[in-house]
Amino acid sequence: MKKIKAGKEWFGEKEASTSTRPYRLTFWCLKHFPRWLVNFITYCAALYFFIFDKRCRLESIRYQKNLKDYSQTFSKIKPLRQVATFAVTIVEKIDCWTNPIPFENIRFSDDDSSALIEQLNQGKGAFIIISHLGDSEVLRSLANKNEIGIKKTIPIAVLSDRDVSSNFSKAMNKMNHNFTLNTIDVNDITPATIEKIMDTINQGGLVVCAGDRLSKNKSERYLTQNFLGKPAPFSYGVYFLADLVAAPTYFVWGFRRGNIVLRRDCEMFVVKAQAKLGGGRKGREERMNALCAEFVQKLEFFVQKYPYQWYNFFDFWMFPNGEENAN
């Protein structure tokens, strides 16, 4: 295959849509149309973006080509399938916040889920690292505390880019007045926000953040790990915070069973990090890199298992200096 040129730097790019109308229209369709029709509309929207959004198409091909070169189990490059899967996930994300996935539709793997639930029942908080692989909205199942064995309401603080998530939050508030999302802007981490994070942990809550993207305002600081056989930059701040709060840390993934069908069936994976955290400034860089390496190892495992549920549509291997394979 012809070599794909390095993509534009995406750090600092603004949200593509500045309107809440697409979210509200999707909600209206979910409320009034049968599922088969919503499926059809979703596929049409995915095809439209696949044809007219060159960057989305090329970055999907770049990722799948790298995966094919790295993995012995992935052999077919299907960028349209990945874009369609992403479109379905967006629809299900809106559906999840207005109509939570029934507990019986979520399959918990035999991993560290029980350890996390037991820890929360003991009033001990945790630091959760997610990614843009799969659908992290499955975490909302924790709200169904009686069904999974959690005996109390768990406070959850989400670290996210408010410039990107603000329109989604506004739309959800209009569609569901019970919608509440305690967010902390990753682009404005101060001593006050760190104190807020610590308070959430000390109250037995969860602090959730994505470990696979750089902060747009702190993109010059990053950790380097090999991902699918090539060096890639990973968030510095997420792993710094994990070591700073020194709380038990878990990697969480939620995946749809079936790539391009609105079926609301999910599988949830919870993996407790083994890296030793805390201990002050001495050795912090080593601990951060150890945690990041552990996360990337799991990310590589799951990306081969669910290859079309990868939702980073940019040059993932580009460093802030505009080069790939930076040292």
Predicted features, each with a name:
Residues 102-108, 182-188, 227-229, 281:
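Short, flexible loop segments at the rims of nucleotide/cofactor-binding pockets, characterized by
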Residues 21, 56, 108, 189, ...:
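Soluble or luminal CAZymes and related metallo-dependent hydrolases
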Residues 58, 114, 137, 169-170, ...:
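Residue-level marker for well-ordered alpha-helical positions
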Residues 145, 174, 178, 191-327:
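Non-catalytic C-terminal accessory region of glycerolipid acyltransferases
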Residues 120-188, 217-223:
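Catalytic core of membrane glycerolipid acyltransferases/transacylases, capturing the structured
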Residues 111, 159-161, 184-186, 271-273, ...:
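Conserved beta-strand termini and adjacent loop/short-helix elements that scaffold enzyme active sites
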Residues 15-16, 50, 162, 187, ...:
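A generic secondary-structure micro-motif detector
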Residues 2-135, 171-174:
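Membrane-anchoring hydrophobic helices of lipid-metabolizing enzymes
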